[in-house]
Structures are given as structure tokens and as C-alpha cells.
């Protein structure tokens, strides 16, 4: 789950002098509502409590509160939540290209901010976040949870023990099947201006894994790619699955009501 790695050490969420950590969540999509919201209370309610939920959609806020299991205040105004909810920690699970808007303000309020990866979608927004952290008492954590999978943790142990000898080069491939891969193109992740393409949104995991596994970072990065399978290159094309006239023939049709 998204929060597993960051929350594995529950005392990190404890407050000096006791009491539960007051958490605010902005962005109540599936990721925020279930993997961060519901998971957090199910496993760490003894050190964590929700003090505020924020989204521009009031109906979604009500739904999220029910799934999470909280009766905390709900806000459609982010600044109001920051000013009224007395937060210790802020969790950001909004559209990737908007992360910086919420992270920067959270840091300026002196909060511990946990954001879904990627931190944001371009270098200008990244620099704004870095500057905000440097000039505030807040701190930022980015949720790169792949590190905490059993297979990757074991691989790290093997490398640290030098069981495979000295590394001289790495050849890394990640194959994304059409079951998982298609899901990105049913939502905003398929839009370049929202998610930065899968070279950022998805591959951020893989870049982090490599940096962590081999203990170094690249000096130069080159990337290339294209849309070969989905979108306008697909055999069928509709504005959205639920209203698509090709739903009976398309391999990628998904009924969100089920």
C-alpha cells in the first residue's frame, strides 16, 4: 500500500508529549481515499487522527469520509483547512501537475508534507518546492513505495552483501502489461499536462529503485518514447468508457459501476 513504507515506523507519527498526529488530506481520489486515508486509520489510529479532508468536489468529500471512516471537518477551500484544522501532517494526493500548489503552502505552514510521487511535473515547480522547504520549518517526504516490496528489499540486501560481486553496469527493463497499462489512459494520467507522461509518473518508481539499489545517481539522463498502443493509435476511440459506442468490442473497456 502507498503508506506502508513511510508508516512502517509508527512512532515517527507520534507527537512530542503524546497525543495523536493530526493529519489533513488534500485530493480524495482512489489513491488518497483508500491507500492513504483508509489504510492510515485501519493500521495507525493509535497515533494518527484525521483533522481535515479537502477537495473541490463536495460529493466526493462525503464519499471519501465514509470510506475512510472519519467525521473530521471537510473543506472545499484548501487555505481554510490550513488555517483552521491545526494540522501536524499534510498528505497530498491531487493531480500530479498541481502537487506544488499544495506542497509549498503546507511547508510554509511548517507542516510535515507527504506527497504521492512524482513530487511534481517539471523543474520550475520542483525548484519552488525545494526553495519552500529550505526557507520553512516544514519537511517533505515523497511516497516512492516500490523500495519496500519484499523482492526489492531482498535484492538490496544481496547487493549490499556483494553476493553478485562488484557492479559495473545495470540493464533495467520494466514491462507494463495492457491490464495495468490501459488503466492510466482511462483517467488524467494519460494527459501530458496533468501527469507528465508515464516516463515521469510511472518511471519515477524505477529511477528511484535504481538510485537506491546501486547507491548512486545519474549525471545525465536521456529519454525518448511515444504513444504506440493507446489513444488515437487504438482500434477504437471514444471520449470515455461509460459512453463509448465501442464498449462491446474494445479490449480496454472498463465498467466503473462494477
Give the residues covered by each predicted segment.
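Short, Asp-centered acidic motifs that coordinate Mg2+ and/or phosphate
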Residues: 52, 88-89, 169
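Conserved SAM-binding strand-loop segment of SAM-dependent methyltransferases
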Residues: 72-77
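Beta-strand-loop-alpha-helix segment that lines the small-molecule cofactor/substrate pocket
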Residues: 89, 95-96, 100-147, 162
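N-terminal Rossmann-like dinucleotide-binding module
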Residues: 2-69
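Nucleotide donor/acceptor-binding cores
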Residues: 19-21, 138, 165-168
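Predominantly a Rossmann-like dinucleotide-binding segment in NAD(P)-dependent oxidoreductases
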Residues: 31-32, 146-258
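Glycine-rich, N-terminal phosphate-binding loop of Rossmann-like dinucleotide-binding domains
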Residues: 93-94, 174
Amino acid at each position: 500500500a502507498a503508506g506502508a513504507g513511510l508508516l512502517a515506523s509508527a512512532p515517527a507519527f507520534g507527537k512530542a508529549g503524546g497525543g495523536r498526529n493530526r493529519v489533513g488530506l488534500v485530493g480524495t481520489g482512489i489513491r488518497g481515499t483508500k491507500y492513504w486515508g483508509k489504510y492510515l486509520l485501519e493500521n495507525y489510529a493509535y497515533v494518527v487522527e484525521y483533522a481535515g479532508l479537502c477537495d473541490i468536489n463536495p460529493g466526493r468529500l462525503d464519499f471519501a469520509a465514509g470510506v475512510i471512516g472519519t467525521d473530521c471537518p471537510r473543506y472545499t477551500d484548501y487555505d481554510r483547512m490550513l488555517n483552521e484544522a491545526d494540522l501536524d501532517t499534510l498528505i497530498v494526493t491531487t493531480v500530479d501537475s498541481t502537487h506544488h500548489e499544495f506542497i509549498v503552502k503546507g511547508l510554509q505552514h511548517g507542516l510535515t508534507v507527504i506527497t504521492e510521487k512524482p513530487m511534481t511535473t517539471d523543474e520550475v515547480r520542483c525548484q519552488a518546492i525545494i526553495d519552500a522547504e529550505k526557507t520553512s520549518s516544514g519537511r517533505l517526504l515523497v511516497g516512492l513505495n516500490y523500495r519496500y516490496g519484499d523482492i526489492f528489499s531482498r535484492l538490496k540486501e544481496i547487493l549490499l552483501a556483494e553476493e553478485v560481486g562488484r557492479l559495473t553496469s545495470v540493464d533495467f527493463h520494466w514491462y507494463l502489461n495492457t491490464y495495468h497499462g490501459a488503466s492510466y489512459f482511462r483517467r488524467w494520467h494519460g494527459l501530458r499536462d496533468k501527469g507528465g507522461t508515464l516516463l515521469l509518473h510511472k518511471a519515477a518508481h524505477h529511477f528511484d529503485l535504481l538510485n537506491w539499489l546501486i547507491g548512486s545517481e545519474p549525471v545525465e539522463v536521456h529519454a525518448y518514447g511515444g504513444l504506440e498502443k493507446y489513444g488515437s493509435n487504438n482500434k477504437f476511440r471514444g471520449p470515455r468508457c461509460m459512453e463509448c459506442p465501442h464498449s462491446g468490442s474494445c479490449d480496454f473497456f472498463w465498467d466503473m459501476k462494477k
